[in-house]
């Protein structure tokens, strides 16, 4: 039960016109104020308190202070897409109080950063950089070590949050947080190896010294699919190198951004260091554009789509800044005629279905030698039947939801394109062998899909960010390599074979 207070206003926020109320209070204008400041609406969200989250959160950490003067957004669980919705059945009146059942609730609310918040944060970060770069690298490494330990202490809770808010299964959520911990360990070692060079000089009795100096501030813009691991890949190295970090997380995973920042902020505070060394913003394109344009940020790391990445690169280049870009992928697995078929089938399953096909390195194209084509395909179809789809927090689930309703709609559009090509009786048309439908539910669930298709089909050359696997034949290794390289995205590829000469030919 949720208790709501009843107030009387001239300009109401919300009117109730159900007959029991309007009959007895027909002369009054009613307004309700929802009181949920003290606890989460659902018990399964209560663990979020252990990592510093509440029903309402400020989404900007600037100058070592939490603030937020931008729009208020809602963090939604992709397994059920629940938003604030009150069930008015069995409504009871009790002396200016209402009690009724609430049937659907989002996870929490977040107040995003405004452009004013951004500017305040950047001013403080710019000043903090002067302090941080003067601290010896091994001591910076010690701070990163403490961050890693703080993450270890909250590994389970953070991993659970990743699964809850992003939608990947719990094992993947915990594994993602572990990646940051591992990067902290790596960066600690690196902090004692930032060596320069001694270079012989042409002048007698002279030598030249080369040493590394911090850039100052590194901007990190991360995507929803790996909402905290990508931060670790960038921030751990930036911090030990003496750079401050400005982080903008994905707008659809704000709670992860806040929880991670609270961990880092706690370590900085414990060591009496400026909180502005690590500045973070929850926000949308406006904040991302500000980072890309900001001349105080010499290096911007962006992870996301090729379309947006191109825009970021152009903006940063126009001010002669530097970019690190990790963009779209269209990854292939090549299975040669001598491969271990069972091993290949199991590996392809998780490569194509894991994270609901929303990894940058998801297997999207499966290239099978014609002599084993049907055998591998039969095994793959069999293991696809065993995929458990559902709540990513439940044991045994292998395929969670797509991250947003828009992603589910994009999956459906992609399937329609595949079907239309097949209906056109095109030599490049696709045939759906299994899956191919969204699952009727409140969540963003879709069926894992296998499509038999020509490598020349236009749809194969696009990145459909969903669990859709395109299967195609090849006759020779040369042909397989040509197919592998025939898409504009690339990013990663894999091979199954027992022959070293084939491996070396494949890797060039």
PLM feature spans:
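C-terminal segments
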Residues: 21, 34-40, 182-185, 189-193, ...
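Structural signal for hydrophobic packing residues in well-ordered secondary-structure cores
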Residues: 129, 133, 148-155, 159, ...
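Terminal low-complexity tails and localization/encapsulation signals of metabolic enzymes
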Residues: 2-4, 11-21, 25-87, 93-109, ...
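ALDH superfamily catalytic-core signature
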Residues: 266, 307-455, 473, 477-478, ...
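Conserved C-terminal structural/oligomerization subdomain of aldehyde/semialdehyde dehydrogenase
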Residues: 33, 79-87, 100-108, 272, ...
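Glycine-rich loop-to-alpha-helix module at the N-terminal edge of alpha/beta enzyme cores
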Residues: 82-96, 103-194, 205
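Rossmann-like NAD(P) dinucleotide-binding subdomain of oxidoreductase/dehydrogenase enzymes
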Residues: 152, 196-343, 474
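Residue-level signal for inorganic ion chemistry
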Residues: 81, 140, 162, 184, ...
């Amino acid at each position: 039960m949720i208790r709501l207070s009843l107030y009387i206003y001239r300009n109401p926020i919300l009117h109730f016109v159900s007959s029991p109320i309007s009959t007895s209070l027909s002369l009054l204008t009613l307004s309700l104020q929802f009181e949920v400041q003290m606890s989460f609406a659902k018990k399964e969200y209560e663990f979020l308190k252990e990592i510093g989250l509440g029903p309402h959160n400020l989404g900007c950490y600037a100058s070592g202070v939490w603030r937020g003067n931008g729009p208020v957004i809602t963090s939604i669980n992709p397994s059920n897409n629940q938003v604030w919705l009150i069930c008015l059945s069995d409504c009871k009146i009790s002396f200016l109080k209402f009690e009724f059942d609430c049937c659907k609730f989002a996870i929490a609310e977040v107040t995003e950063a405004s452009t004013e918040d951004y500017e305040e944060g950047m001013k403080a970060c710019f000043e903090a950089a002067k302090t941080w770069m003067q601290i010896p690298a091994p001591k910076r490494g010690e701070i990163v070590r403490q961050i890693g330990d703080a993450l270890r202490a909250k590994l389970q809770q953070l991993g659970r949050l990743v699964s809850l808010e992003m939608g990947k299964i719990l094992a993947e959520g915990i594994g993602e947080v572990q990646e940051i911990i591992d990067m902290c360990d790596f960066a600690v070692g690196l902090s004692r190896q930032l060596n320069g060079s001694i270079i012989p000089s042409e002048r007698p009795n002279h030598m030249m010294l080369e040493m590394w100096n911090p850039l100052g501030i590194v901007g990190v813009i991360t995507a929803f699919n790996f909402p905290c691991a990508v931060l670790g890949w960038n921030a751990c190295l930036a911090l030990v190198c003496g750079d401050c970090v400005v982080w903008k997380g994905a707008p659809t995973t704000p709670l992860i951004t806040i929880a991670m920042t609270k961990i880092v902020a706690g370590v900085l505070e414990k060591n009496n260091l400026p909180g502005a060394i690590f500045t973070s913003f929850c926000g949308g394109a406006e904040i991302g554009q500000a980072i890309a344009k900001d001349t105080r940020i010499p290096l911007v790391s962006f992870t996301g789509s090729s379309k947006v990445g191109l825009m970021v690169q152009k903006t940063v280049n126009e001010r002669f800044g530097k970019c690190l870009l990790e963009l779209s992928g269209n990854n292939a697995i090549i299975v040669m005629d001598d491969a271990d078929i069972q091993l290949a089938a199991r590996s392809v399953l998780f490569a194509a279905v894991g994270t609901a096909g929303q990894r940058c390195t998801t297997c999207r194209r499966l290239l099978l030698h014609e002599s084993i084509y049907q055998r591998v395909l039969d095994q793959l179809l069999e293991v696809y039947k065993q995929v458990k789809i559902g709540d990513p927090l439940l044991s045994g689930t292998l395929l969670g939801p797509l991250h947003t309703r828009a992603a589910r709609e994009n999956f459906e559009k992609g399937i329609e394109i595949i079907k239309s090509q097949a209906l056109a009786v095109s030599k490049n048309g696709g045939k759906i062998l299994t899956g191919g439908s969204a699952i009727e539910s409140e969540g963003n669930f879709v069926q894992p899909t296998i499509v038999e298709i020509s490598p020349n089909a236009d749809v194969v050359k696009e990145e459909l960010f969903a669990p859709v696997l395109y299967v195609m034949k090849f006759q020779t290794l040369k042909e397989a390599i040509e197919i592998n390289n025939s898409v504009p995205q690339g990013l990663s590829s894999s091979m199954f074979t027992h022959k070293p000469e084939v491996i070396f030919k494949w890797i060039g």
